Design a protein with these regions (language model features):
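Gly/Ser/Thr-rich loops at beta-strand to alpha-helix junctions
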Residues: 48-55, 113-115, 140-144, 226-230
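Catalytic loop of short-chain dehydrogenase/reductase
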Residues: 154-264, 270-293
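The beta1-alpha1 cofactor-binding region of Rossmann-like NAD(H)/NADP(H)-dependent oxidoreductases
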Residues: 109-121
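Canonical Rossmann dinucleotide-binding motif of NAD(H)/NADP(H)-dependent dehydrogenases/reductases
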Residues: 35-74, 78
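NAD(P)H-dependent oxidoreductase Rossmann-fold/reductase module
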Residues: 1-29, 99, 230-394
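Rossmann-fold scaffold of SDR-type NAD(P)-dependent oxidoreductases
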Residues: 47, 132-140, 219-224
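Glycine-rich phosphate-binding loop and adjoining beta1-alpha1-beta2 segment
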Residues: 66-105, 111
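A glycine-rich helix->loop->beta "capping" turn
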Residues: 106, 120-149
Length: 394
């Protein structure tokens, strides 16, 4: 079939297999261009491995350090007349490229929150890999069925305490408008922590430890975002921020467990704001990202997921580097984004932005290009008018 982008709201409902493979190749090429990452991981488990930061971590581990990787994700294969999700195509492309380069790459497609998928993962690690020395936890999910209670928790992106009004942008139509987001109920706040907090990460680490599948000195990392004051009511001080506080609680608990197990470590890496499937869904944030891209590109400090993860691995995690923590014990690769001159420039632009000047004051075009790239569209060297086979498997 011929596959074209179909955007509905903040999601594209089609994905292009050849384009997704080209996007993966771009990421591989970037990591290889930076040279080997020494003293890197050997056996890596990535939970949430099919898109965004999780996928970029997987690419960096294999093509930077030659690591064997097992990716866990929840993606939909193609159906009659309908392409698969981009994460499905991404994971196939990564797996083929990694194996062609001589690296072990396996995948488990299913609900990472479930006990069954954890057991399946442990069995595969025990059979094929041996103890894991890096666990990357990078799940973004709208819901979680609790493995112990069976309760279904749904996450929401809402402020806490009071409704919040600010500017936002419809990234598809390039229209700036004001949006008011109602505040979360207590139940919504609790549910969001249950989905996006640290409990499941702890369960994964406990399961690996119980099965004796954590290497001495193992590292566990989860990803977070803090961002600037413009986004705080809906992000840092909202429901998702409360979940990230719980993730930090979990990091400390896991760190204590791993430290006692051969000097291991666990921490949160605070990453840069980027166009991802997850961030597109958050009101206010896409407008901030469009301005951020404009400012950082002008300064020559713009990074995407793969640049961020390559830098995290090469300058913080491995290569004989020492982790640099902030006052709260977090690693910061949002450091370039949060530089005062970048944030001051954004604060100056923010009040001025309208639909009419959006194209000049922000990088909305760059945002739209990056967004479509997530789904395999707009990649150089891909013929989007050609028939392509949507039904591909591992």
């Amino acid at each position: 079939m011929i596959i074209k982008p179909k955007v509905r709201g903040f999601v594209c409902v089609t994905a292009h297999p050849t384009g997704c493979a080209a996007h993966i190749q771009q990421q591989i090429d970037h990591v290889k261009s930076k040279g080997p990452i020494k003293q890197g991981p050997k056996n890596v488990l990535v939970i949430g491995a099919s898109t965004g930061y999780g996928l970029a971590s997987r690419v960096t581990a294999s093509f930077g350090s030659g690591a064997a990787t097992l990716g866990v994700f929840y993606e939909r294969p193609s159906e009659e007349g309908r392409p698969a999700t981009p994460g499905w195509y991404n994971s196939i492309a990564f797996t083929r490229a990694a194996r062609a380069a001589g690296y072990y790459a396996e995948n488990i497609n299913g609900d990472a929150f479930s006990e069954a998928i954890k057991q399946q993962t442990l069995a595969m690690i025990a059979r094929d890999m041996g103890p894991i020395d890096l666990v990357v936890y990078s799940l973004a999910s709208p819901r979680r069925t609790h493995p112990k209670t069976g309760a279904v928790h749904k996450s929401v992106l809402k402020p806490l305490g009071a409704p919040y009004t600010n500017k936002t942008v419809d990234t598809d139509k390039a229209i700036v408008s004001e949006v008011t987001i109602d505040s979360a109920t207590e139940m919504e706040a609790t549910d969001t922590v249950a989905v996006m907090g640290g409990e499941d990460w702890e369960m994964w680490i406990q399961a690996l430890a119980d099965a004796k599948l954590l290497a001495p000195g193992a590292t566990a990392v989860a990803y977070s975002y803090i961002g600037p004051v413009h986004t705080w009511p809906v992000y840092k001080d909202g429901t998702i921020g409360a979940a990230k506080v719980d993730l930090e609680r979990a990091a400390m608990a896991i760190n204590a467990k791993l430290a006692a197990h051969g000097n291991g470590r666990a921490f949160i890496s605070v990453n840069k704001a980027l166009v991802t499937q997850a961030s597109s869904a958050i009101p206010v944030v896409p407008l901030y990202i469009a301005i951020l891209y404009k400012v950082m590109k002008a300064k020559g400090t713009h990074e995407g997921c793969i640049e961020q993860m390559q830098r995290l691995f090469a300058t913080q995690l491995y290569n004989g580097s020492k982790l640099q923590f902030d006052g709260a014990g977090r690693v910061r690769v949002d450091d370039w984004e949060m530089r005062p001159e970048i944030q001051d420039a954004i604060s100056a632009i923010w009040p001025q932005v309208t639909t009419e000047n959006l194209a000049t004051l922000t990088d909305i075009a760059g945002y739209q290009t990056e967004f479509l790239k997530l789904f395999g569209f707009g990649l150089p060297g891909v013929n989007y008018d050609a028939e392509v086979e949507p039904h591909i498997t591992f």
